[in-house]
């Protein structure tokens, strides 16, 4: 299994990461992009939004709410999405 970047932390049987954005609207745009990506993966994170900060947590409910390869795969895809939207 390919390793997930260190910015994701495994806590209480979930894979978690926070992303900070310059504005509330850019945070919401990211949430919408994550939603579309999640649909393609048929795997959906728990999402929280606190002004400019988006929190994501992943676990595989079908396997008893544990972290699986499916979670790591989506985490890597989300990281690629985030990097593709970073200001240059």
At which residue positions do the language-model features occur?
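Short amphipathic alpha-helix segments
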Residues: 26-34
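A generic structural motif
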Residues: 52-59
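C-terminal structural segments of small proteins and small subunits
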Residues: 59-87
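Conserved glycine-rich FAD pyrophosphate-binding loop
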Residues: 50-52, 64
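Short, well-ordered beta-strand elements within core beta-sheets of diverse protein domains
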Residues: 14-22
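Short aromatic-glycine-(Arg/Gly/Cys) micro-motifs in beta-strand/loop hairpins
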Residues: 1-14
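Short, glycine- and small/hydrophobic-rich beta-strand elements in well-ordered beta-sheets
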Residues: 6, 46-48
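Short arginine-rich
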Residues: 10, 35-45, 83
